């Protein structure tokens, strides 16, 4: 169809539904620089205020998928699956989940992102491993998935380039938090990766982008409905982010946590519950398990047998990391020069955590970004974070700061003390997995 961008913008501005061919033409022009930044910004703002129905969101997602390459894994011989998280603090689930389900017979070509603001990024964590290539060429990406079972890499310029352009414009026009635009951005990249099934981790709480359960439900429902409408079988779990998920926040410190988890050292934790819940969902979707209970048992066996650890080690090695990384992580991971415990301000029960603020402490230490061009220090962060609901005595460490200087460490200790609330009575703690959306 002939494209008149301002007519499409006007129709959406006036609250009218756009036809799939209108959306496809607009996005195709956007990806080929046939749409000005002003027109793209106006379109994003019109969608922000007027919204989109399901059919429009499906059309937008498919158009953004088709703006670049779409990978095919027909020759892989395994079900192709992935998981996406909306982001939080201490969320290193992908690092363990990919090798666990790969050990159970799935192929996981995981396209991940970097951290921005208070949330950590999977790619930043992996880059704490010297030599690990988060941007391999397609041949190495395919070879890794084929030979290892999983590969965690970054988005290349050839996958959903329209999303990259539109996101950059949304970022500077206050249109990031639009459900239709979030949905299309997430799913276009996943569809371009050639997945057969997808699970979504929609986080809710004071450390998540979605602060209320109702908002999380709206986003989860939109993602599941649009993904299924686009031909990608998808389920979502809404998970709690009112405290860090793992006991570390940072980059090298979360890799250490990952290795401890894969070695069986995090049994019974909230992190284990979330990881195994997502593994079970993926295995049921791929018909490797008949029930979620069977899927969880298969995932637990992959973990306890050491097969998941072995696959993680192979992934690191094939993608350029040290071949003996698992045996000698301390030889390769950067260590901060200043390590300082955070004492409990008083005796009582850890009752609350300002999780977003805790994530910002990591950024202030140098372990995160406030703008995409910022450089990260992989060594800094927070470790040994106690979970909510435990009893502490005054002066007992509730976390440990890893900093580049004494001044940074002392400032972080004070900030972390302020992040935690200590009560006289044991608090009620939310479950780690709150709801399942299908």
From Swiss-Prot:
Keywords: Glycosyltransferase, Transferase. One of its GO terms (biological process) is thymidine metabolic process. GO terms for cellular component: cytosol. InterPro entries: Glycosyl_Trfase_fam3, Glycosyl_Trfase_fam3_N_dom, Glycosyl_Trfase_fam3_N_dom_sf, Nuc_phospho_transferase, PYNP-like_C_sf, PYNP_C, Pyrmidine_PPas_bac/euk, Pyrmidine_PPase_CS. The keyword Transferase applies. It catalyses: thymidine + phosphate = 2-deoxy-alpha-D-ribose 1-phosphate + thymine. Homodimer. Belongs to the thymidine/pyrimidine-nucleoside phosphorylase family. The enzymes which catalyze the reversible phosphorolysis of pyrimidine nucleosides are involved in the degradation of these compounds and in their utilization as carbon and energy sources, or in the rescue of pyrimidine bases for nucleotide synthesis. This is Thymidine phosphorylase. The gene is deoA.
């Amino acid at each position: 169809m002939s494209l008149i961008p301002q007519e499409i913008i006007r129709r959406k501005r006036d609250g009218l539904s756009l036809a799939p061919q209108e959306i496809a033409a607009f996005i195709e022009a956007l990806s080929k620089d046939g749409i000005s930044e002003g027109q793209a910004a106006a379109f994003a703002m019109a969608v922000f205020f007027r919204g989109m129905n399901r059919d429009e969101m499906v059309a937008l997602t498919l158009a953004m998928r088709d703006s670049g390459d779409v990978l095919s894994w027909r020759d892989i011989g395994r079900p192709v699956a992935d998981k996406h998280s909306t982001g939080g603090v201490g969320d290193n689930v992908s690092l363990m989940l990919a090798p666990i389900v790969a050990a159970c017979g799935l192929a996981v070509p995981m396209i991940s992102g970097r951290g921005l603001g208070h949330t950590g990024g999977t790619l930043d964590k992996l880059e704490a491993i010297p030599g690990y290539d988060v941007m391999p060429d397609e041949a190495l990406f395919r070879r890794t998935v084929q030979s290892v079972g999983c590969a965690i890499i970054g988005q290349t310029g050839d996958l959903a380039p329209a999303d990259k352009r539109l996101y950059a414009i949304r970022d500077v026009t206050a249109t990031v938090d639009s459900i239709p635009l979030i949905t299309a951005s997430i799913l276009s990249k996943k569809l371009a990766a050639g997945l057969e099934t997808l699970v979504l981790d929609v986080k809710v709480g004071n450390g998540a982008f979605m602060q209320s359960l109702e908002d999380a439900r709206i986003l989860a429902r939109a993602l599941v409905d649009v993904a299924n409408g686009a031909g990608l079988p998808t389920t979502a779990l809404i998970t709690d982010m009112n405290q860090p998920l793992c006991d570390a926040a940072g980059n090298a410190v979360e890799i250490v946590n990952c290795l401890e988890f894969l070695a069986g050292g995090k049994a019974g934790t909230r992190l284990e519950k979330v990881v195994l819940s997502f593994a079970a969902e993926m295995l049921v979707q791929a018909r490797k398990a008949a029930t979620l209970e069977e899927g969880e048992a298969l995932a637990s066996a992959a973990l306890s047998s050491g097969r998941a650890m072995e696959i993680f080690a192979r992934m690191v090695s094939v993608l350029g990391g040290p071949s003996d990384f698992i045996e000698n992580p301390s030889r390769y991971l950067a260590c901060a020069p200043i390590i300082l415990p955070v004492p409990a301000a008083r005796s009582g029960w850890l009752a609350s955590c300002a999780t977003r603020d805790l994530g910002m402490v990591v950024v202030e230490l140098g372990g995160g970004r406030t703008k995409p061009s910022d450089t990260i220090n992989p060594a800094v962060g927070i470790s040994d974070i106690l979970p909510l609901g435990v009893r502490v005595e005054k002066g007992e460490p509730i976390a440990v700061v890893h900093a580049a200087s004494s001044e940074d460490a002392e400032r972080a200790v004070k900030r972390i003390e302020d992040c935690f609330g200590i009560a006289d009575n044991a608090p009620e703690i939310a479950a780690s997995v709150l709801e399942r959306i299908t």
